[in-house]
Amino acid sequence: MKIEVIKKEQDLLEFYLEGEDHTFANLLTETLRENPHVKFVAYTIEHPILMARKPRFRVVTDGKITPEKALEEAAKKIFDRAKEVLDAWEKAIKG
């Protein structure tokens, strides 16, 4: 995974997330939408063949937090949820 920043302002961040596709892009988008300070978030894949694994994101916040902080919080939330799934899976296997 590689992040390439395209545009950065106080309450706006546009970036490419190289090496990912719709699976992670949807997860990140939905997790960002849960943050009340995120006013807009969306991604697009600009070309289905040439850029299939390089979604372009746009994140806009209300100015109370930066888009970078919103992304940091979303990443932590995704990690915590993945850990919950792993713990539940391990518990289910052990019976």
Swiss-Prot record:
One of its GO terms (molecular function) is protein dimerization activity. One of its GO terms (biological process) is DNA-templated transcription. Its EC number is 2.7.7.6. InterPro entries: RBP11-like, RBP11-like_dimer, RNA_pol_Rpb11_13-16kDa_CS, Rpo11-like. This is DNA-directed RNA polymerase subunit Rpo11. It is an enzyme of class 2 (transferase). DNA-dependent RNA polymerase (RNAP) catalyzes the transcription of DNA into RNA using the four ribonucleoside triphosphates as substrates. PANTHER family: DNA-DIRECTED RNA POLYMERASE I,II,III (PTHR13946), DNA-DIRECTED RNA POLYMERASES I AND III SUBUNIT RPAC2 (PTHR13946:SF28). Belongs to the archaeal Rpo11/eukaryotic RPB11/RPC19 RNA polymerase subunit family. It catalyses: RNA(n) + a ribonucleoside 5'-triphosphate = RNA(n+1) + diphosphate. HAMAP family: RNApol_arch_Rpo11. Part of the RNA polymerase complex. Pfam families: RNA_pol_L_2. It is found in: Cytoplasm. Gene3D superfamilies: RNA polymerase, RBP11-like subunit (3.30.1360.10). GO terms for cellular component: cytoplasm; DNA-directed RNA polymerase complex. Keywords: Cytoplasm, DNA-directed RNA polymerase, Nucleotidyltransferase, Transcription, Transferase.
